[in-house]
Amino acid sequence: MHMVGPLMTNQTLATITKRIIERSAASRSDYLARMEQMRGQGPLRGSLSCSNLAHGFAACSEQDKQTLKLTESANIGIINAYNDMLSAHQPLESYPALVKAAAHSVGCTAQVAGGVPAMCDGVTQGTAGMELSLFSRDIIAGATAISLSHNMFDAALCLGVCDKIVPGLLIGALSFGHLPVAFAPAGPMTSGLSNKEKAAVRQAYAEGKVGRDALLEAESAAYHGEGTCTFYGTANSNQMLMEVMGLHIPGAAFEPPGTQLRDQLTRAATERLCKICLLYTSPS
């Protein structure tokens, strides 16, 4: 059998990585110290005043209120990037109810901690709205941190898919890096009109051989339903990165929306968060 030797890191990449480590040493040390301090405080909702805690679970069911009064079971904070503008995010509308049910099944609770904006380059390209695209990442990061700042949560589940949204969610969640965090995506759009066929219609339109109605029909047939883009763009590469980083349940990136397996993966992400919380207790 032919044995492959150890993999060699590209020297340029190794040099850049070393430089980043050196430049960030002080700030990383401060960050880790801050996270360790936050971790040492234990369940933060247990140290909230009665008035604070009552506000935090006022809208919950009586059963959840009783659970949240204690600090023996995990409470998952859901950060949701749902809207109807992004095909990849539209399926997230139903996720909070699914997550709450999954948490209940293992004796825990879940609350929607907050929502974050999400914009699609596919909608805004060629318009002034595109100028906000990259800036939106910082808004998303801030909104994520604000959502978790209620100090009611033992873990966080981030619901988001596309570029700017996933990095923003991750950056914001790292402000609470002592908490377990997982991501749950919506999955890819099913295949529609092929790129070759779509390109042919675009060419015909450019030549004046077909009208706008035919062009729109072709574009709609190619990009036709819920889920991530039907091409290997940054929405899909973000999902691969989340899975490689261990922030997804394995296999979660490319299961289409609306399937039983898709729901099972979302439930599994919730249950996994509950299990890795130090507070996890099995239901009796």
Protein language model features and the residues they cover:
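Ligand/cofactor-recognition surfaces for anionic moieties
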Residues: 2
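Helix-enriched interaction subdomains in cytosolic or periplasmic regions
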Residues: 5-52
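A short, flexible low-complexity segment enriched in Lys/Arg and Gly/Pro that occurs
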Residues: 19-23, 54-62, 208, 212-213, ...
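N-terminal glycine-rich phosphate/pyrophosphate-binding loops that anchor nucleotide-derived ligands
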Residues: 33-72, 85, 95-99, 105, ...
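Gly-rich Lys/Arg/Thr-decorated short loops/hinges at beta-loop-alpha junctions or inter-strand turns
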Residues: 35-37, 42, 76-83, 118-130, ...
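Long, structured ligand/cofactor-binding scaffold of large enzymes
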Residues: 58-179
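Active-site cavity-forming subdomains of large catalytic enzyme subunits
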Residues: 130-279
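Conserved small/polar residues in nucleotide/adenosyl-binding loops
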Residues: 280-284
